[in-house]
Amino acid sequence: NTDTYPVEYIVRGAAVTINGATVGENYINAARGASIAYQQALRWKIENDDEYAAKAVENLNKWVQTCVGVTGNSNVSLAAGLYGYEFAIAGQLLREYEGWDPEDFLAFQQWLLKVFYPANKDFLVRHHDTNHLHYWANWGLCNIASTIAIGIVTDRRDIYNEGIEHFQSGVTNGRLRRAIYYDYSPEYNFAQWQESGRDQGHTLMCVGLVGVICQLAWSQGDDFFAYDDNLFLRGC
């Protein structure tokens, strides 16, 4: 199924009351919607078949026209981070597609800035009023990825820089030297992730998120694959 099913509010973590009605978790709609749009955009880039781009744009436009916010409990930060960067990357792949009306693309940019970016920034700055090391690394990393991706697709160097600065020197476990917290070099050429003591799935999620961050930065001429004497490589 290549259709998407946008929701007015992306809800993650707990049911919420919106306009007098209880709305349960529905974040899977955003996860699927962003993934579908990205895969369609990628197929367009690879095969140069406008049918894929047209469907991806149709799906993204539906989200822009429908979704006005991200909510829930503290897990709202995961929704904003994960789906924020995924939607942004899909849009970036499609920005050269001539069939995307410039006004619709502008609306998409503004949508990212209104719906996802404020939640990304709030987590990186305030982290729900907890100790700055309270949340696992993937929470910080996904919000860094979203901040950087949104900065790129909206042509906002200031937002891009916010994400990069946090990745280098931020206070949360999303900072690279905290996400990869134990470095065995120079004796051994490997390093250990902050999430390694949790489980394999979340540890590999961190690997994937840092890979996304590094590739986003690479597209802008910044090399974080080799940053800090190849720290990411040692973590892999």
Residue map of PLM features:
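Extracellular glycan-targeting catalytic surfaces
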Residues: N1-D129, L141, A145, E165-Q168, ...
